[in-house]
UniProtKB/Swiss-Prot annotation:
Listed GO MF terms: structural constituent of ribosome
Keywords carried by this UniProt record: Ribonucleoprotein, Ribosomal protein
Name of the molecule in the record: Large ribosomal subunit protein bL27
Residues excised as propeptide: 1-9
Region (Disordered): 13-34
Pfam families (UniProt xref): Ribosomal_L27 (PF01016)
Family: Belongs to the bacterial ribosomal protein bL27 family.
Lineage of the species this protein comes from: Bacteria, Bacillati, Bacillota, Bacilli, Bacillales
Membrane-traversing stretches: none
Tagged with keyword Lyase: no
Length: 92
């Protein structure tokens, strides 16, 4: 009698895992109040990483570099020197 040696191979190859496939949530950074806009004290003016915009008159800087109004007033963005910006709040 004939003896046959049958071997079956996988019809689908095993698929390895990928190192991609995830993404972080956006941090919603940027200016939150426009130039000339009226704000109340405590309003967030700019959310940023590092000091892209510097605090000016009546503006505070939080621990995560967020700029906020210290008083009620009107927002004013100003240029300081060639490559620096600051934001101030002046009483209305």
């Amino acid at each position: 009698m004939l003896k046959m040696d049958l071997q079956f191979f996988a019809s689908k190859k095993g698929v390895g895992s990928t190192k991609n496939g995830r993404d972080s949530h956006s941090k919603r950074l940027g200016a939150k109040r426009a130039d000339g806009q009226a704000v109340t004290g405590g309003s967030i003016l700019v959310r940023q990483r590092g000091t892209r915009v510097y605090p000016g008159e009546n503006v505070g800087k939080g621990g995560d570099d967020t700029l906020f109004a210290k008083i009620d007033g009107v927002v004013k963005y100003e240029r300081v020197g060639r490559d620096r910006k600051k934001v101030s709040v002046y009483p209305a």
